[in-house]
Structure formats: structure tokens, C-alpha cells
A protein has these predicted regions:
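Patatin-like phospholipase
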Residues: 1-250
Length: 250
């Protein structure tokens, strides 16, 4: 059910990388996103008072940090789904958190963040003369481009949806004030909008991703552990972050 597993990653994090391996031991809140294999729910691992679930979400409090990371990074079909035992002894399987829902910025906002910085590496290739057309690079490059285009569409739709809600909310707020309509009706209508679409007007979002001209990122081996490859990816990410943060005066 996968070419590899993330069990070695879990062991490395548990034995060598993490000084604390339980969510409740941390001084800050940490949430790790996965996808429930045998359901359609998104899984949110964290320090919750109890595990609970809704129609679309499963809040998991019985996983260690290393187990949650191993589950979240199990990207099919390269990595097999990762099993975590519940307190009742039932093994629940999870895989990559991006499968069910891209970015999941609502998790930070739902837990009190007023600035959410979301970083992702997906950037479809844009034609450049020095590289040429992707058809010259064979099936792997074409498949990668197709996958990136699908994911980018989901991300752009998510960002556009957030922007549309913000614009509608601000337009209604401004109209009521401009027309000097009753304050209690304005507040009530805005409260209904916030509740129905889970909108938080005091939360700002910053999205960091490679720029279209960063074709090196597209061709980089994201699964490589080679130090030079990793250093190159980190440098591209750092430059992308600086470029985006400067646009937001951060």
C-alpha cells in the first residue's frame, strides 16, 4: 500500500530530534494536520481535552508528536498510511494532511491566531526560454506539472473564497454605516455572517510560495535528503519568504 513507510521518520523524531514528544508538554500550541484514511474527515492532532469528531473533522488527542508527523507526511502512493492506536486499542490509519483540504489555515484562526502565515512549495512551471517546454522533459515532468496545477487551483480557490467573504463583510458593514441604518441590525447581520461562514474579521493571512520564475524549485527533488539539494530548496524558500513579507511591510 506504499513504496515506503514513515516509521523510520517517527523513530528518528522520537529518539533524536524532539526533546518533548507530547503535545501537552509544549509551551506553545501545536496542531498537525492529517487525513483519516477510512473516512472523509480531516484529522487535527493536538492537545485537546478529549478526542471528538464532527462530520468533516476529527480532533485527535491520543497521538504523540512524532506519530502525528509520521501520519501527516505519509504521502500516497510513495508512503503507506500510518497507523496510530486509539486509547481503546483500535488502530486508526491516517495519511497526508493536504489530501482532504489544502492549507487548513482555519485551524490557526480557530485557535486564536490574528496573523496566519501559510507556506507551501507548490508552483506550476511557467515557460522560460532558457528551460523551454516541459514536453521535452518526459512523463515525470508533465505529471508533476498536472499535479501542481490541480493543487494550485485548490489553493487559489481557497484564497479567493477568503477574499470574497472579506469583501462582502466589509461592504455590508460600510453600507450600514453610510446609510446610518440601525446599529443593532448591522451587528446582528455581521454576526450571522461570521457564524455561517466561520469568518474572523480580525485575522490576516500571508501566503508564501515560490515565484513563477523559480523554475529550479519545480525541478528540485523534494524527496531528496542530499544536503546540497536541501540547501538549494531552503535558499529558494527563504528568498520567496523575504519577497512576500516585504510586500506586507513585515
Amino acid at each position: 500500500n506504499g513504496l515506503f513507510t514513515t516509521r523510520a521518520l517517527e523513530k528518528y523524531l522520537r529518539n533524536y530530534a524532539l526533546s518533548h514528544n507530547e503535545f501537552q508538554q509544549l509551551g506553545a500550541e501545536l496542531f498537525i494536520i492529517g487525513t483519516q484514511l477510512n473516512h472523509t474527515r480531516k484529522a487535527i492532532f493536538g492537545n485537546f481535552p478529549e478526542s471528538r469528531k464532527t462530520q468533516y473533522l476529527k480532533f485527535v488527542n491520543y497521538a504523540s508528536i512524532s506519530e502525528a508527523v509520521a501520519a501527516s507526511t505519509s504521502l500516497p502512493p510513495v508512503f503507506a498510511p500510518y497507523g496510530i492506536k486509539s486509547p481503546k486499542g483500535k488502530e486508526m490509519f491516517f495519511f497526508d494532511g493536504e489530501i482532504r483540504d489544502t492549507l487548513s489555515t482555519h485551524v490557526a484562526a480557530d485557535h486564536g491566531a490574528d496573523l496566519v502565515i501559510s507556506s507551501y512549495s507548490i508552483q506550476p512551471y511557467h515557460y522560460t526560454p532558457e528551460i523551454g517546454s516541459l514536453h521535452q522533459f518526459g512523463i515525470p515532468a508533465i505529471l508533476n506539472q498536472a499535479l501542481y496545477q490541480v493543487i494550485e487551483q485548490k489553493i487559489n480557490r481557497h484564497i479567493s473564497h477568503q477574499g470574497d467573504i472579506r469583501a462582502i463583510y466589509q461592504s455590508i458593514d460600510g453600507y450600514f454605516k453610510q446609510q446610518k441604518l440601525p446599529e443593532e441590525h448591522r451587528e446582528r447581520l455581521l454576526a450571522i455572517i461570521r457564524e455561517r461562514v466561520n469568518y474572523k474579521p480580525n485575522v490576516d493571512y500571508v501566503y508564501i510560495h515560490p515565484r513563477p520564475q523559480n523554475h529550479e524549485m519545480f525541478f528540485a527533488d523534494h524527496f531528496s535528503l542530499n544536503s546540497q539539494v536541501l540547501e538549494h530548496i531552503v535558499r529558494i524558500g527563504f528568498k520567496s519568504a523575504i519577497h512576500t513579507l516585504r510586500q506586507h511591510d513585515l
